[in-house]
Amino acid sequence: MLTLNMNLNYQIDNYCLNISFLSLFISMICYWLVIAFPKKIFFLKFAHFEVSLANILLVYLLAYRWLKYSYFPLSNLYESLLFLSWSLTTIQLILEFKFKHKLIGAIASPISTLTLAFSSFFLPKYMQEVSPLIPALKSNWLLMHVSVILISYAMLLIGSLLSILFLLLSRNNKLNYTKNNNLTTASNSNDTLILKNEDKLNLLNTIDNLSYRIIGLGFPFLTIGIISGAVWANEAWGSYWSWDPKETWALITWIIFAIYLHTRINKSWQGKKSAIVAGFGFVVVWICYLGVNFLGKGLHSYGWFL
């Protein structure tokens, strides 16, 4: 009977994961179709439905593990990937509701889709199984520290991806735009480009502002996550900071986005220069979250691949 229940639970989890991935994949296609065909509002509504469905299923998967095993499911890489996928979809839905812009979904849906695909199809099965908590994780700080860090990663990833999109769309122009009658001029390295259609300028400004706002929201979460991690480390290991690879790269991530926010204050650095910093931050976040796990070194052993 116990084996039967375990198999049934595994099948339900597997179905939920597959449906979640399929929903996110469909939503990604729909968002891209909306970008290609702006008047087809049906695709946008269907994309919202699919993201919401995936979000609900991820809530079920996390809640089921929480209730069944009596601790919040953030004890290993697989569970953290599920939580990151949920964070990405939740933040996407909130931002879309607040800012009413389809670009957010077009940028966020590929990340959440790939994150969930990695957790479901690429991680070994033994890493997806539930195991007893190691002593260092038997703390109330588990929920506080890890959840806040992952939520910050979700915001920073979405915001920095928007900056990368900004760089791609503005790669032929500088952002020293001035208006002259009904035309918009942009300084180019060789000449002055006359933009008869102001839509591109408005789009660039929208992307730039969205990126700044989202990263501005994620940075305080990252700060709180690092501080709470230091307090927890002192309780668990007797030291606030040990220059563990994960700690070191978390600090590097914080510095990169602190530099980004500082560049936004300086007008000469706004636009492409600050977007380059944010784009670099996108890579650094993934190194901090996944890259250091390949090292197999440090105190954060529960996240290793090796």
UniProtKB/Swiss-Prot annotation:
The keyword DNA-binding does not apply. It is a multi-pass membrane protein. GO terms for biological process: cytochrome complex assembly. Keywords: Chloroplast, Cytochrome c-type biogenesis, Membrane, Plastid, Thylakoid, Transmembrane, Transmembrane helix. Pfam families: Cytochrom_C_asm. GO terms for cellular component: chloroplast thylakoid membrane; plasma membrane. The chain crosses the membrane at residues 17-37, 41-61, 77-97, 103-123, 148-168, 214-234, 241-261, 275-295. One of its GO terms (molecular function) is heme binding. It is found in: Plastid, Chloroplast thylakoid membrane. Although originally identified as Cyanidium caldarium, these sequences derive from Galdieria sulphuraria. Required during biogenesis of c-type cytochromes (cytochrome c6 and cytochrome f) at the step of heme attachment. Belongs to the CcmF/CycK/Ccl1/NrfE/CcsA family. NCBIfam families: cytochr_II_ccsB. May interact with Ccs1. This is Cytochrome c biogenesis protein CcsA.
